[in-house]
Design a protein with these regions (language model features):
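Catalytic histidine-centered segment of alpha/beta-hydrolase-like enzymes
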Residues: 208-220
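Acidic catalytic loop of the alpha/beta-hydrolase fold
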Residues: 179-183, 210
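Active-site nucleophile loop of the alpha/beta-hydrolase fold
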Residues: 2-4, 208
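Short alpha-helix in the alpha/beta-hydrolase fold that links the catalytic acid
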Residues: 4, 160-161, 170, 184-193
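Short beta-strand/loop motif that positions the catalytic acidic residue
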Residues: 167-169, 174-176, 180
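Short glycine-rich catalytic loops that host catalytic nucleophiles or stabilize transition states
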Residues: 202-208
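Alpha/beta-hydrolase
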Residues: 5-160
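C-terminal alpha-helix
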Residues: 222-230
């Protein structure tokens, strides 16, 4: 949620960037919402800015631990126990980040954004994303500094299919459920298109949700036929 104004205050909000603000197009669940494309562009840019701010907090924490580790190596544990103890505990310390409001994709409520067959809402909301954004649980809410940087940061993580798929050269199939509330068809196609394999297959599983409930046999048959044609 890019409208978070203070990482230490879950209620501190920049109204102009709040997707749950009526002036920006939000309506209470289950009414559909409509977000202006120009506002949405500012929103997406602000999301990147917030990730950068969290990255800076995480990197500063890691740098402090590294610096303390370098200092402790120069200390005589037997000769200066107090100084060694202080720097050693700083060196091994792991900061935990509480990352508030992580369920804030306007596409959850505005189905005209990357239109597909998905319903309103999110896999992680029960059912209202507004409540899930502020409620307990959610994605990446409590992370170590290294955990945030390596897995969730869109700027620092190396776990990016855009970077890794070009190195995948084996035959590749992607079965995309068209009613997935989390992954857009555009994104699924981009994943396949970026693959380094000469043999790629993209299949849309019409009406299937994220975990393929009600469509798993169909998905299994698709994958089995694909494997049989290449490896039987």
């Amino acid at each position: 949620d890019p409208s978070v104004a203070d990482e230490n205050d879950p209620f501190a909000t920049v109204p102009e960037l709040d997707m749950y603000e009526p002036d920006n197009g939000w309506r209470p669940w289950p009414e559909p919402c409509t977000y202006d494309p120009a506002w949405l562009a500012r929103y997406r840019a602000a999301q990147v800015d917030r990730v950068a701010r969290i990255d800076a907090i995480a990197k500063a924490s890691i740098a402090e631990s590294v610096d303390a580790g370098q200092r402790v190596r120069g200390l005589d544990k037997a000769g200066d126990v107090a100084a060694w103890r202080e720097q050693r505990r700083r060196a091994v310390f792991t900061q935990y980040l509480t990352i508030y409001r992580t369920l804030a994709d306007p596409a959850y409520l505005d189905l005209s954004i990357d239109a597909d067959e998905r319903p309103m809402g999110s896999l992680f909301a029960f059912p209202d994303p507004f409540e899930a954004n502020y409620g307990r649980g959610g994605l990446a809410r409590t992370m170590t500094a290294r955990g945030w940087l390596s897995t969730w940061s869109g700027l620092s993580s190396h776990a990016k299919l855009a970077d890794t798929m070009p190195r995948v050269t084996v035959p590749t199939i992607l079965v995309h459920p068209t009613a997935d509330t989390e992954i857009r068809m555009r994104q699924a196609k981009e994943i396949v298109d970026s693959a380094g394999a000469a043999d790629t297959t993209y299949v849309e599983l019409a009406g299937a949700p994220h975990y393929l409930e009600g469509h798993r046999r169909e998905a299994l048959a698709i994958v089995a036929d694909w494997l049989r044609a290449r490896f039987a």
